[in-house]
């Protein structure tokens, strides 16, 4: 079960809010007090809420769902990209395009264009004219900045994790419209309404942003590792069951077919047959005795030649 600690939050400066004159009254229950005109966030309330968010992220990952990391402001951009890539999740760190989730069909067209340009770049743009190659390179770079983090998504994400719900208000609005769960860092100057998993904390400090993203990424990685271990255990148990003597799950390839067993036993029990040359060298009495072993009926009136014909 993913958990963080009060010590980590203090070290990251999570408790520092905005100036008291810019506060949102709806955040009042999360504010401890004021120091030098700056609101101080009550970490005793942040801690259980953040742990709830971490557990939710773990559960979502364990069932194979995706979490979209969103942080487009300068302080968050590089951190969001780094941590999302580390845990194998999609991200948006440059600019939120309108309709990125609510109009995903159109966005998929742009993603396809980006992949086509990347393929052409691998083949070498030099096959095109200098001006055309330059224009294609610029287009690819522009699309990469906006869509590079979601180009491997096959559908809209299942959850979004937002660093600053004020800056990312368009992303939050689209998630609400699609009824997607939102994990959001909410500072003292914003309202927590509409955020499913509120994490009251500093959303401006690079250290604090790095802490949030790192903890969420760690929870995701732990869930993936636990799921992978569980699958490996199930596979190993199945292998042991197939090797167990008398088990009904014995691999089919190890059990000979019924017809093959019958044929083998017939071949082993049936005496070897002789050719005509060998039969001609035998006396009639020996031929009759041999015929009995072969299950061939010989009449007393049969000549040696007729007997050989029946046995051959």
Curated annotation (Swiss-Prot):
Coiled-coil portions: none
Xref: CDD domains: RPS2 (cd01425)
SUPFAM superfamilies assigned to the protein according to its UniProt record, in alphabetical order: Ribosomal protein S2
InterPro entries attached to this UniProt entry: Ribosomal_uS2 (IPR001865), Ribosomal_uS2_bac/mit/plastid (IPR005706), Ribosomal_uS2_CS (IPR018130), Ribosomal_uS2_flav_dom_sf (IPR023591)
GO process annotations (BP): translation
GO MF annotations in UniProt: structural constituent of ribosome
GO CC terms of this entry: cytosolic small ribosomal subunit
Keyword set, alphabetical order: Ribonucleoprotein, Ribosomal protein
Cross-referenced PROSITE patterns: RIBOSOMAL_S2_1 (PS00962), RIBOSOMAL_S2_2 (PS00963)
HAMAP family referenced in this protein's UniProt entry, alphabetically: Ribosomal_uS2_B
Family membership: Belongs to the universal ribosomal protein uS2 family.
PANTHER family associated with the record: 30S RIBOSOMAL PROTEIN S2 PROKARYOTIC AND ORGANELLAR, SMALL RIBOSOMAL SUBUNIT PROTEIN US2M
Protein's name according to its UniProt entry: Small ribosomal subunit protein uS2
Organism: Ruthia magnifica subsp. Calyptogena magnifica
């Amino acid at each position: 079960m993913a958990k963080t600690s009060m010590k980590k939050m203090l070290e990251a400066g999570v408790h520092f809010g905005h100036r008291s004159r810019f506060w949102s009254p709806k955040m009042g229950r999360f504010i401890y007090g004021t120091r030098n005109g700056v609101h101080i966030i009550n970490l005793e309330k942040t801690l259980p809420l953040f742990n709830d968010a971490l557990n939710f992220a773990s559960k979502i990952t364990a069932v194979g769902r995706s979490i979209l990391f969103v942080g487009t402001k300068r302080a968050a951009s590089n951190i969001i990209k780094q941590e999302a890539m580390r845990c194998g999740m999609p991200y948006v760190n440059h600019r939120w395009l309108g309709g990125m989730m609510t109009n995903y069909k159109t966005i998929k067209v742009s993603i396809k264009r980006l992949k086509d340009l990347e393929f052409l770049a691998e083949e070498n743009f030099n096959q095109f004219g200098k001006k055309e190659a330059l224009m294609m390179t610029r287009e690819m770079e522009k699309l990469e900045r906006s869509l590079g983090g979601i180009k491997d998504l096959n559908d809209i994400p299942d959850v979004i994790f937002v660093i600053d719900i004020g800056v990312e208000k368009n992303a939050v609005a689209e998630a609400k419209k699609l009824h997607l769960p939102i994990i959001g860092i909410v500072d003292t100057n914003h309202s927590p309404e509409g955020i499913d998993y509120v994490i009251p904390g500093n959303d401006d400090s690079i250290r604090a942003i790095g802490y949030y993203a790192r903890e969420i990424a760690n929870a995701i990685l732990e869930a993936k590792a636990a799921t992978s271990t569980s699958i490996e255990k199930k596979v190993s148990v199945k292998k042991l069951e197939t090797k167990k003597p008398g088990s009904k799950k014995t691999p089919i390839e190890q059990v000979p077919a019924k017809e093959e067993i019958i044929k083998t036993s017939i071949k082993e029990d049936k005496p070897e047959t002789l050719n005509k040359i060998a039969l001609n060298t035998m006396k009639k009495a020996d031929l009759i005795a041999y015929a009995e072993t072969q299950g061939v009926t010989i009449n007393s009136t049969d000549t040696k030649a007729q007997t050989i014909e029946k046995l051959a």
